[in-house]
């Protein structure tokens, strides 16, 4: 029976990137989804990027992924967040037209031979401990050498409006009813997680004159260097909760399925519902909310920061307690969704199941929260699924390589007991792993892995040769008694001013000029982080043999032995990041390894 090399289950942000990456390697790919028209839809906020997330998108772009292209093409408002802070944490956020984003994502996917199939996957097809493909609810069998599960919130999904619930993966769409049982049968541990989304408000019912306007930046930012035609088109707005908002929530917590104990799933710590904010931060008089347009021609605005699972009739009162929303009409109510997710410590660093070779997973099913986290995992899972189908070894991104490396290392090495969100604070080498140098860091890997053509690498290498040449020129240049580099390191000085006084032989692009300025001004910090990276690599070089009997390692604490036995780290670096493993345990393990364990 003819089949596929890779079958991707789900058409969200993880599934899109998985199918796109797998197809880059020339294998036969099928993407199975209940509704192909909804591929790439954004069920929550209509935006891409933000702190920690824009860095992920930049790395996805560098690795040949499609999210950055789709976001730029659909952009209607862009801003760089944390602009007043250092380059390590500056983060682009791109507001998009929700429908246009999905359309552009589907158009990009169609550039590669991915077969899109309508259907619900009911089970993995496994015989004799081997993965043979998937079976669908309507009785089809789809043979495949590898499968990527990217089911988002659909695995046994339940949506909640107050104390009332119904099976759904998200509003108006049925859940994946059977796949969870198949994953359990393979040996995976499933947990219940929860997330939520705010209400959508009819735009003509909002008094925008009472809101604070946030204009788009001009010129607009972009992930790919090619801003879309509408990237500086629309503003966003801000409002705040009031004393009445908080009172309505506190007086009606018994109607919340979370506080009433109906929802067993664990919600995201860093994206809490408005109920959680009011309860957890009782000392705050108000909470900032962002009012975002859903698109260029939509009649809806999105109330970011106001996700809720309270009943619809109460949401009406809550929304109308906000300045500018006194006459607001809710088009779609907020709701919570509860779903199954895997324990990611049961995966390899290539996002492959430890129980069933050829089975990969990505996105919220791995315990993460957010489009960007899903896309990053999808790309890695799709790449490795294709490599598995071709008989090639798994590849992964080490922690020191960037944000995707940290994301996967945290998930697989430490696990998560709540929906995981990427933040800049999680990344030890964030000054080395900036969004602006993702191309330098990851394009060589993308080309080596078959995700991008060699001419892309040649362009990137030429760019950084020009940067290096300009840094050498500035080192030799004398300005006011010091070298050009020393002059540029003064806080009040800029490369633009220096280049106007002492022009380079060939003008640099804005991106190249930015690289010169960052590398000059932060040279000392960059050198410090490079030394830290070398230490991390030294620990990574300490490989731990497969099947090591940790309880027999002399000097290892009982807790460390238990944790190491559970997580099975492959290196001393991985062992160091496991909670409960102390420095003394690492020393004992290193001594044991040096003795030829």
Curated annotation (Swiss-Prot):
GO terms for cellular component: cytosol. FAD binds at residues 10-15. One of its GO terms (biological process) is tRNA wobble uridine modification. Its main location: cytoplasm. It comes from the Bacteria. Pfam families: GIDA, GIDA_C_1st, SAM_GIDA_C. NAD(+) binds at residues 267-281. Its cofactor is FAD. It is found in: Cytoplasm. Keywords: Cytoplasm, FAD, Flavoprotein, NAD, tRNA processing. Coiled coil: none annotated. Disulfide bonds: none annotated. One of its GO terms (molecular function) is flavin adenine dinucleotide binding. Homodimer. Heterotetramer of two MnmE and two MnmG subunits. NAD-binding protein involved in the addition of a carboxymethylaminomethyl (cmnm) group at the wobble position (U34) of certain tRNAs, forming tRNA-cmnm(5)s(2)U34. Belongs to the MnmG family. NCBIfam families: mnmG_gidA. PANTHER family: GLUCOSE INHIBITED DIVISION PROTEIN A, PROTEIN MTO1 HOMOLOG, MITOCHONDRIAL. This is tRNA uridine 5-carboxymethylaminomethyl modification enzyme MnmG.
């Amino acid at each position: 029976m003819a089949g596929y090399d890779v079958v991707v289950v789900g058409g969200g942000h993880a599934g899109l990137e998985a199918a796109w990456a797998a197809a880059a390697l020339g294998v036969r790919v099928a993407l199975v989804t209940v509704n192909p028209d909804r591929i790439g839809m954004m069920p929550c906020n209509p935006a891409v990027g933000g702190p920690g997330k824009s860095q992920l998108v930049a790395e996805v772009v560098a690795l040949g992924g499609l999210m950055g292209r789709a976001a730029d093409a659909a952009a209607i408002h862009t801003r760089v967040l944390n602009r007043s802070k250092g380059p390590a944490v500056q983060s682009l956020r791109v507001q998009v037209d929700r429908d246009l984003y999905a359309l552009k994502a589907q158009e990009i996917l169609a550039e590669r031979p991915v077969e899109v199939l309508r259907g619900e996957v009911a089970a993995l097809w496994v015989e004799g401990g081997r993965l043979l493909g998937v079976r669908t609810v309507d009785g089809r069998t789809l043979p495949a050498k590898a499968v990527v599960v990217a089911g988002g919130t659909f695995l046994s999904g339940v949506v909640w409006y107050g104390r009332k619930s119904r099976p759904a993966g998200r509003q108006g769409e049925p859940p994946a009813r059977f796949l969870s049982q198949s994953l359990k049968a393979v040996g995976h541990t499933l947990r219940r997680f929860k997330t939520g989304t705010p209400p959508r408000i009819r735009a003509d019912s909002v008094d925008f004159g009472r809101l604070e306007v946030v204009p788009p930046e001009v010129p607009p930012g972009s992930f790919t260097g090619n801003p879309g035609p509408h990237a500086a088109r629309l503003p966003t707005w801000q409002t705040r909760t009031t004393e009445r908002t908080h009172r309505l929530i506190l007086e009606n917590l018994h109607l919340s399925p979370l506080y009433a104990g109906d929802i067993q799933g664990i919600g995201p710590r860093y994206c809490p519902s408005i109920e959680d904010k009011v309860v957890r931060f009782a000392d705050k008089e108000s909470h900032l909310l962002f009012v975002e347009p859903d698109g260029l021609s939509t009649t809806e605005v999105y109330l970011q920061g106001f996700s809720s699972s309270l009943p619809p009739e109460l949401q009406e009162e809550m929304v109308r307690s906000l300045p500018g929303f006194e006459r607001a009409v809710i088009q779609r109510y907020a709701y919570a969704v509860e779903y199954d997710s895997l324990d990611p410590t049961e995966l390899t660093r290539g996002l492959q199941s430890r129980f069933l070779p050829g089975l990969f997973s990505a996105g919220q099913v791995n315990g993460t929260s957010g489009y960007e986290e899903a896309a990053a995992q999808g790309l890695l899972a799709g790449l490795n699924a294709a490599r598995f189908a071709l008989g090639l070894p798994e590849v992964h991104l080490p922690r020191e390589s960037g944000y995707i490396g940290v994301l996967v290392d945290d998930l697989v090495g430490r696990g998560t007991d709540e929906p995981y969100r990427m933040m800049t604070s999680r990344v030890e080498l964030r000054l080395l792993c900036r969004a602006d140098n993702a191309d330098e860091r990851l394009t060589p890997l993308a080309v080596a892995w078959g995700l991008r053509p060699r001419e892309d690498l040649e362009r990137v290498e030429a760019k950084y040769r020009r940067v290096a040449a300009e840094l050498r020129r500035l080192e030799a240049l004398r300005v006011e008694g010091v070298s050009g580099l020393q002059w540029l390191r003064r806080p009040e000085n800029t490369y633009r001013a220096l280049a106007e006084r002492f022009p380079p032989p060939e003008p640099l692009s804005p991106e190249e000029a930015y690289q010169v300025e960052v590398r000059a001004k932060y040279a000392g910090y960059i050198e410090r982080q490079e030394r830290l990276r070398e230490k991390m690599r030294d620990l990574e070089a300490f490989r731990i043999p497969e099947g090591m009997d940790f309880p027999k390692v002399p000097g290892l604490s009982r807790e460390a032995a238990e944790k190491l036995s559970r997580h099975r780290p492959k290196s001393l670096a991985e062992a160091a990041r496991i909670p409960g493993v102390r420095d003394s345990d690492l020393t004992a393990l290193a001594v044991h390894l040096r003795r030829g364990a």
